[in-house]
Amino acid sequence: MSMPTIRAVRALTVRGGGADYHDQDAGHWIDDHIATPMSRYPEYRQSRQSFGINVLGTLVIEVEASDGTVGFAVTTGGEIGAFIVERHLARFIEGQRVTDIEKMWDQMFHATLYYGRKGVVLNAISGVDLALWDLLAKVRREPVHQLLGGKVRDELEFYATGARPDLAKEMGFIGGKLPLHHGPAEGEAGLRRNLDALADMRSRVGADFWLMLDCWMSLDVPYATRLAHEAHALGLKWIEECLPPDDYWGYAKLRRDVPRGMLVTTGEHEATRWGFRMLLEMECCDIIQPDVGWCGGLTELIRISALADARGVLVIPHGSSVYSYHFVATRHNSPFAEFLMMAPQADRVVPMFDPLLLDEPVPVGGRMKVPDTPGFGVRLNPDVRMQRPYEH
Protein backbone atom coordinates (compact mmCIF):
# COMPACT_ATOMS: atom_id res chain seq x y z
CA MET A 1 0.00 0.00 0.00
CA SER A 2 1.48 3.33 -1.04
CA MET A 3 1.04 6.11 1.47
CA PRO A 4 -0.85 9.21 0.32
CA THR A 5 0.72 12.64 0.41
CA ILE A 6 -0.69 15.80 1.96
CA ARG A 7 -2.29 18.12 -0.57
CA ALA A 8 -3.78 20.85 1.62
CA VAL A 9 -3.46 22.51 5.02
CA ARG A 10 -6.18 24.83 6.34
CA ALA A 11 -6.21 26.96 9.50
CA LEU A 12 -9.61 27.99 10.86
CA THR A 13 -10.71 29.99 13.89
CA VAL A 14 -13.63 29.73 16.31
CA ARG A 15 -14.90 31.96 19.10
CA GLY A 16 -16.75 30.82 22.23
CA GLY A 17 -15.48 27.69 23.98
CA GLY A 18 -13.67 25.01 22.05
CA ALA A 19 -9.98 24.65 22.80
CA ASP A 20 -9.75 28.17 24.24
CA TYR A 21 -11.67 27.12 27.32
CA HIS A 22 -11.40 30.61 28.86
CA ASP A 23 -13.51 32.02 26.01
CA GLN A 24 -16.80 31.63 27.91
CA ASP A 25 -19.93 33.67 28.53
CA ALA A 26 -20.30 35.76 31.69
CA GLY A 27 -20.99 33.86 34.90
CA HIS A 28 -18.77 30.87 34.14
CA TRP A 29 -16.75 29.67 37.13
CA ILE A 30 -13.53 29.83 35.08
CA ASP A 31 -13.86 33.62 34.79
CA ASP A 32 -14.41 34.24 38.50
CA HIS A 33 -12.13 36.12 40.91
CA ILE A 34 -9.18 33.74 40.40
CA ALA A 35 -5.54 34.52 41.12
CA THR A 36 -3.43 35.26 38.04
CA PRO A 37 -0.13 37.05 37.31
CA MET A 38 -2.29 40.15 36.74
CA SER A 39 -3.88 39.99 40.20
CA ARG A 40 -1.27 42.47 41.39
CA TYR A 41 -3.46 45.08 39.67
CA PRO A 42 -6.83 45.56 41.43
CA GLU A 43 -8.63 46.40 38.19
CA TYR A 44 -7.82 42.96 36.75
CA ARG A 45 -8.72 40.74 39.73
CA GLN A 46 -12.44 40.18 39.49
CA SER A 47 -12.50 38.67 35.99
CA ARG A 48 -9.74 36.92 34.10
CA GLN A 49 -11.25 38.07 30.82
CA SER A 50 -10.66 41.65 31.97
CA PHE A 51 -6.96 41.33 31.14
CA GLY A 52 -7.59 39.45 27.90
CA ILE A 53 -7.13 35.79 28.83
CA ASN A 54 -9.56 34.86 26.05
CA VAL A 55 -8.28 37.09 23.24
CA LEU A 56 -6.78 34.29 21.13
CA GLY A 57 -9.73 31.97 20.62
CA THR A 58 -9.63 28.47 19.17
CA LEU A 59 -7.45 27.37 16.26
CA VAL A 60 -8.61 24.45 14.10
CA ILE A 61 -6.10 22.78 11.78
CA GLU A 62 -7.20 20.54 8.91
CA VAL A 63 -4.77 18.48 6.83
CA GLU A 64 -6.12 16.78 3.72
CA ALA A 65 -4.40 13.83 2.05
CA SER A 66 -4.27 13.01 -1.64
CA ASP A 67 -6.78 10.19 -1.11
CA GLY A 68 -9.31 12.62 0.39
CA THR A 69 -8.79 11.66 4.03
CA VAL A 70 -8.89 14.67 6.38
CA GLY A 71 -7.21 14.85 9.76
CA PHE A 72 -7.82 17.73 12.13
CA ALA A 73 -7.00 19.03 15.58
CA VAL A 74 -7.89 21.98 17.79
CA THR A 75 -5.79 24.11 20.11
CA THR A 76 -5.53 27.69 21.34
CA GLY A 77 -4.15 30.23 18.89
CA GLY A 78 -6.92 31.98 16.98
CA GLU A 79 -5.99 34.35 14.15
CA ILE A 80 -2.34 34.65 15.20
CA GLY A 81 -1.95 30.89 15.03
CA ALA A 82 -3.84 30.74 11.75
CA PHE A 83 -1.44 33.26 10.20
CA ILE A 84 1.58 31.22 11.31
CA VAL A 85 0.13 27.99 9.91
CA GLU A 86 -1.06 29.39 6.58
CA ARG A 87 1.80 31.76 5.79
CA HIS A 88 4.74 29.82 7.23
CA LEU A 89 4.16 26.22 8.35
CA ALA A 90 2.06 24.98 5.41
CA ARG A 91 5.11 24.84 3.12
CA PHE A 92 6.63 22.12 5.32
CA ILE A 93 3.46 20.00 5.26
CA GLU A 94 1.98 20.06 1.76
CA GLY A 95 3.54 17.50 -0.56
CA GLN A 96 4.91 15.35 2.27
CA ARG A 97 3.91 11.74 2.87
CA VAL A 98 1.44 11.35 5.71
CA THR A 99 3.97 9.14 7.51
CA ASP A 100 6.72 11.78 7.64
CA ILE A 101 5.58 13.35 10.91
CA GLU A 102 9.04 13.54 12.49
CA LYS A 103 10.49 15.38 9.50
CA MET A 104 7.59 17.81 9.37
CA TRP A 105 7.85 18.57 13.10
CA ASP A 106 11.59 19.15 12.85
CA GLN A 107 11.23 21.54 9.92
CA MET A 108 8.40 23.50 11.54
CA PHE A 109 10.31 23.90 14.78
CA HIS A 110 13.66 24.89 13.32
CA ALA A 111 12.11 27.25 10.76
CA THR A 112 10.43 29.21 13.56
CA LEU A 113 13.29 29.26 16.09
CA TYR A 114 14.02 32.92 15.46
CA TYR A 115 10.55 33.98 16.61
CA GLY A 116 9.14 30.88 18.25
CA ARG A 117 10.39 28.26 20.73
CA LYS A 118 7.36 28.66 23.02
CA GLY A 119 3.98 30.35 23.19
CA VAL A 120 1.59 30.72 20.29
CA VAL A 121 4.13 29.44 17.73
CA LEU A 122 4.37 26.15 19.61
CA ASN A 123 0.58 26.10 19.88
CA ALA A 124 0.42 26.30 16.09
CA ILE A 125 3.05 23.59 15.63
CA SER A 126 1.24 21.45 18.20
CA GLY A 127 -2.06 21.83 16.36
CA VAL A 128 -0.53 20.82 13.04
CA ASP A 129 1.24 17.89 14.66
CA LEU A 130 -1.95 16.59 16.28
CA ALA A 131 -3.80 16.92 12.98
CA LEU A 132 -1.05 14.88 11.31
CA TRP A 133 -1.43 12.10 13.88
CA ASP A 134 -5.19 12.15 13.37
CA LEU A 135 -4.68 11.92 9.60
CA LEU A 136 -2.17 9.07 9.76
CA ALA A 137 -4.38 7.07 12.11
CA LYS A 138 -7.38 7.57 9.83
CA VAL A 139 -5.38 6.50 6.77
CA ARG A 140 -4.38 3.36 8.64
CA ARG A 141 -7.92 2.94 10.04
CA GLU A 142 -6.59 2.78 13.60
CA PRO A 143 -7.05 4.84 16.75
CA VAL A 144 -4.14 7.08 17.65
CA HIS A 145 -3.46 5.09 20.80
CA GLN A 146 -2.68 2.08 18.60
CA LEU A 147 -0.06 4.10 16.69
CA LEU A 148 1.50 4.93 20.07
CA GLY A 149 2.03 1.26 20.86
CA GLY A 150 -1.34 0.29 22.25
CA LYS A 151 -3.17 0.79 25.52
CA VAL A 152 -1.59 -0.29 28.81
CA ARG A 153 -4.88 0.10 30.71
CA ASP A 154 -8.47 -0.65 29.78
CA GLU A 155 -9.87 2.58 31.16
CA LEU A 156 -8.73 5.95 32.44
CA GLU A 157 -9.59 7.44 35.81
CA PHE A 158 -9.85 11.17 36.31
CA TYR A 159 -9.61 13.99 38.76
CA ALA A 160 -11.79 17.04 38.10
CA THR A 161 -10.67 20.65 37.81
CA GLY A 162 -13.36 23.12 38.75
CA ALA A 163 -15.09 25.15 41.42
CA ARG A 164 -16.97 22.24 43.05
CA PRO A 165 -14.81 19.28 44.10
CA ASP A 166 -17.64 18.23 46.43
CA LEU A 167 -19.86 17.62 43.41
CA ALA A 168 -16.96 15.99 41.56
CA LYS A 169 -16.70 13.47 44.38
CA GLU A 170 -20.39 12.63 44.00
CA MET A 171 -19.77 12.09 40.26
CA GLY A 172 -17.05 9.51 40.95
CA PHE A 173 -13.85 11.48 40.31
CA ILE A 174 -10.76 10.53 42.33
CA GLY A 175 -10.00 14.13 43.30
CA GLY A 176 -10.78 17.76 42.75
CA LYS A 177 -8.56 20.71 41.90
CA LEU A 178 -9.71 24.14 43.03
CA PRO A 179 -8.68 27.46 41.52
CA LEU A 180 -6.83 29.68 43.97
CA HIS A 181 -8.80 32.89 44.33
CA HIS A 182 -6.42 35.35 45.99
CA GLY A 183 -2.80 36.20 45.29
CA PRO A 184 -0.02 37.88 47.29
CA ALA A 185 -1.22 41.40 46.48
CA GLU A 186 -4.38 40.72 48.51
CA GLY A 187 -2.31 40.25 51.64
CA GLU A 188 -3.06 38.36 54.82
CA ALA A 189 -6.80 38.66 54.36
CA GLY A 190 -6.56 37.02 50.94
CA LEU A 191 -4.41 34.19 52.30
CA ARG A 192 -6.94 33.54 55.06
CA ARG A 193 -9.77 33.45 52.50
CA ASN A 194 -7.81 30.93 50.43
CA LEU A 195 -7.32 28.68 53.45
CA ASP A 196 -10.93 29.10 54.60
CA ALA A 197 -12.17 28.03 51.15
CA LEU A 198 -9.91 24.97 51.25
CA ALA A 199 -11.04 24.10 54.78
CA ASP A 200 -14.68 24.42 53.77
CA MET A 201 -14.16 22.12 50.80
CA ARG A 202 -12.27 19.60 52.94
CA SER A 203 -15.22 19.49 55.34
CA ARG A 204 -17.51 18.72 52.40
CA VAL A 205 -15.47 15.96 50.76
CA GLY A 206 -14.04 14.19 53.80
CA ALA A 207 -10.48 13.26 54.68
CA ASP A 208 -9.63 10.82 51.89
CA PHE A 209 -10.65 12.68 48.74
CA TRP A 210 -7.79 14.35 46.87
CA LEU A 211 -7.80 18.14 46.97
CA MET A 212 -5.34 20.23 44.97
CA LEU A 213 -4.84 23.96 44.34
CA ASP A 214 -4.27 25.48 40.90
CA CYS A 215 -2.31 28.71 41.43
CA TRP A 216 -1.94 29.62 37.72
CA MET A 217 1.48 31.32 37.84
CA SER A 218 0.19 33.88 40.37
CA LEU A 219 2.46 33.50 43.43
CA ASP A 220 6.01 34.12 44.59
CA VAL A 221 8.20 31.68 46.50
CA PRO A 222 7.56 33.04 50.04
CA TYR A 223 3.78 33.14 49.57
CA ALA A 224 3.64 29.72 47.90
CA THR A 225 5.78 28.19 50.65
CA ARG A 226 3.59 29.60 53.40
CA LEU A 227 0.42 28.55 51.60
CA ALA A 228 1.79 25.02 51.21
CA HIS A 229 2.63 24.72 54.91
CA GLU A 230 -0.70 26.06 56.13
CA ALA A 231 -2.65 23.97 53.61
CA HIS A 232 -0.77 20.83 54.61
CA ALA A 233 -2.92 20.49 57.73
CA LEU A 234 -5.95 20.42 55.43
CA GLY A 235 -4.59 17.46 53.48
CA LEU A 236 -3.67 19.29 50.27
CA LYS A 237 -2.29 16.70 47.84
CA TRP A 238 -0.46 19.08 45.54
CA ILE A 239 0.14 22.74 44.83
CA GLU A 240 0.17 23.52 41.11
CA GLU A 241 1.89 26.07 38.89
CA CYS A 242 2.61 28.52 41.69
CA LEU A 243 5.29 30.53 39.89
CA PRO A 244 6.00 32.00 36.45
CA PRO A 245 7.03 29.19 34.06
CA ASP A 246 10.59 30.47 33.61
CA ASP A 247 11.38 30.60 37.34
CA TYR A 248 13.05 27.18 37.48
CA TRP A 249 15.16 28.32 40.45
CA GLY A 250 12.06 29.33 42.38
CA TYR A 251 10.38 26.01 41.68
CA ALA A 252 13.46 24.11 42.85
CA LYS A 253 13.49 26.05 46.12
CA LEU A 254 9.74 25.65 46.61
CA ARG A 255 9.96 21.90 46.13
CA ARG A 256 12.73 21.69 48.73
CA ASP A 257 10.76 23.78 51.22
CA VAL A 258 7.20 22.42 51.05
CA PRO A 259 6.04 20.02 53.77
CA ARG A 260 7.12 16.42 53.44
CA GLY A 261 4.58 14.49 51.39
CA MET A 262 3.13 17.47 49.52
CA LEU A 263 3.65 17.39 45.77
CA VAL A 264 4.73 20.33 43.62
CA THR A 265 3.41 20.20 40.06
CA THR A 266 3.88 22.41 37.01
CA GLY A 267 4.43 22.44 33.25
CA GLU A 268 1.09 23.51 31.81
CA HIS A 269 2.74 26.54 30.21
CA GLU A 270 6.10 24.90 29.49
CA ALA A 271 7.04 23.73 26.00
CA THR A 272 9.43 21.33 24.24
CA ARG A 273 11.77 18.70 25.60
CA TRP A 274 14.30 21.41 26.46
CA GLY A 275 11.91 23.30 28.71
CA PHE A 276 10.90 20.12 30.50
CA ARG A 277 14.53 19.02 30.73
CA MET A 278 15.13 22.13 32.85
CA LEU A 279 12.22 21.27 35.14
CA LEU A 280 13.45 17.71 35.53
CA GLU A 281 17.19 18.30 35.89
CA MET A 282 16.68 21.09 38.43
CA GLU A 283 14.21 18.89 40.37
CA CYS A 284 11.53 21.56 40.19
CA CYS A 285 8.51 19.33 40.62
CA ASP A 286 7.12 15.89 41.39
CA ILE A 287 4.66 15.79 38.47
CA ILE A 288 4.91 17.47 35.07
CA GLN A 289 1.73 18.62 33.35
CA PRO A 290 2.42 19.32 29.66
CA ASP A 291 -0.47 20.43 27.49
CA VAL A 292 -0.25 18.43 24.27
CA GLY A 293 -1.83 21.31 22.35
CA TRP A 294 0.84 23.76 23.55
CA CYS A 295 4.05 21.85 24.33
CA GLY A 296 4.85 20.76 20.77
CA GLY A 297 2.14 18.22 20.03
CA LEU A 298 2.10 14.47 20.40
CA THR A 299 5.47 14.08 18.69
CA GLU A 300 7.13 16.21 21.37
CA LEU A 301 5.06 14.86 24.25
CA ILE A 302 6.46 11.39 23.54
CA ARG A 303 9.98 12.76 24.08
CA ILE A 304 8.99 14.75 27.16
CA SER A 305 7.37 11.70 28.72
CA ALA A 306 10.46 9.58 28.11
CA LEU A 307 12.64 12.15 29.90
CA ALA A 308 10.28 12.13 32.86
CA ASP A 309 9.99 8.36 32.94
CA ALA A 310 13.77 8.01 33.15
CA ARG A 311 13.68 10.16 36.29
CA GLY A 312 10.66 8.51 37.88
CA VAL A 313 8.48 11.60 37.44
CA LEU A 314 4.79 11.24 36.60
CA VAL A 315 3.30 12.88 33.50
CA ILE A 316 -0.29 14.05 34.00
CA PRO A 317 -1.13 16.12 30.91
CA HIS A 318 -3.09 19.32 31.26
CA GLY A 319 -6.65 19.02 29.94
CA SER A 320 -6.75 18.65 26.14
CA SER A 321 -9.54 16.08 25.98
CA VAL A 322 -9.01 13.28 23.44
CA TYR A 323 -5.55 14.55 22.53
CA SER A 324 -4.41 13.65 26.05
CA TYR A 325 -6.62 10.60 26.54
CA HIS A 326 -5.04 8.62 23.71
CA PHE A 327 -1.59 9.33 25.13
CA VAL A 328 -2.38 8.63 28.79
CA ALA A 329 -3.90 5.28 27.85
CA THR A 330 -0.53 4.15 26.47
CA ARG A 331 1.86 5.25 29.25
CA HIS A 332 2.55 3.64 32.62
CA ASN A 333 3.92 6.91 34.01
CA SER A 334 0.57 8.63 33.32
CA PRO A 335 -1.65 6.70 35.76
CA PHE A 336 -4.61 9.11 35.71
CA ALA A 337 -5.86 12.13 33.77
CA GLU A 338 -7.36 15.59 34.23
CA PHE A 339 -10.91 16.49 33.28
CA LEU A 340 -11.83 20.18 33.06
CA MET A 341 -15.36 20.78 34.32
CA MET A 342 -16.69 23.08 31.62
CA ALA A 343 -20.29 23.35 32.82
CA PRO A 344 -20.68 27.00 33.93
CA GLN A 345 -21.18 26.04 37.60
CA ALA A 346 -19.02 22.88 37.48
CA ASP A 347 -22.09 20.92 38.51
CA ARG A 348 -22.28 18.40 35.66
CA VAL A 349 -20.05 16.63 33.17
CA VAL A 350 -20.04 18.11 29.67
CA PRO A 351 -17.55 17.52 26.84
CA MET A 352 -14.43 19.60 27.40
CA PHE A 353 -14.45 21.22 23.94
CA ASP A 354 -18.22 21.49 23.63
CA PRO A 355 -19.80 22.49 21.25
CA LEU A 356 -16.94 22.27 18.75
CA LEU A 357 -16.45 18.50 18.68
CA LEU A 358 -18.90 15.68 18.09
CA ASP A 359 -18.44 12.22 19.64
CA GLU A 360 -16.14 13.68 22.32
CA PRO A 361 -16.08 11.10 25.15
CA VAL A 362 -16.64 12.07 28.78
CA PRO A 363 -15.98 10.15 31.99
CA VAL A 364 -18.85 8.31 33.62
CA GLY A 365 -18.39 7.73 37.31
CA GLY A 366 -14.95 9.30 36.97
CA ARG A 367 -13.82 6.69 34.44
CA MET A 368 -13.64 6.32 30.67
CA LYS A 369 -12.75 3.74 28.06
CA VAL A 370 -10.80 5.44 25.27
CA PRO A 371 -12.67 4.77 22.00
CA ASP A 372 -11.15 2.64 19.24
CA THR A 373 -12.52 4.86 16.46
CA PRO A 374 -9.88 5.76 13.84
CA GLY A 375 -7.87 8.89 14.57
CA PHE A 376 -8.69 10.70 17.78
CA GLY A 377 -12.28 9.55 17.35
CA VAL A 378 -13.97 12.95 17.13
CA ARG A 379 -15.59 15.05 14.40
CA LEU A 380 -15.96 18.77 13.88
CA ASN A 381 -19.48 20.01 14.53
CA PRO A 382 -20.78 21.37 11.19
CA ASP A 383 -23.15 23.71 13.06
CA VAL A 384 -20.25 25.63 14.62
CA ARG A 385 -19.32 28.63 12.50
CA MET A 386 -15.63 28.78 11.62
CA GLN A 387 -13.60 31.40 9.77
CA ARG A 388 -10.52 31.04 7.58
CA PRO A 389 -8.84 34.44 8.07
CA TYR A 390 -5.78 33.67 5.93
CA GLU A 391 -4.94 31.52 2.93
CA HIS A 392 -1.67 30.63 1.25
Swiss-Prot record:
> Which residues are responsible for catalysis?
H318 (proton acceptor)
Textual note on the cofactor = Binds 1 Mg(2+) ion per subunit.
Positions binding Mg(2+) in this chain are D214, E240, E268
User: Which keywords appear in this protein's UniProt record, sorted alphabetically?
Assistant: Lyase, Magnesium, Metal-binding
Mitochondrion among the record's keywords? no
Site positions for Transition state stabilizer? E338
Needed cofactors, names only, are: Mg(2+)
Looking at the UniProt record, the site noted as Increases basicity of active site His sits at D291
From the Swiss-Prot or TrEMBL record, give the protein name: L-rhamnonate dehydratase
**Which species expresses this protein natively?**
Burkholderia orbicola (strain MC0-3)
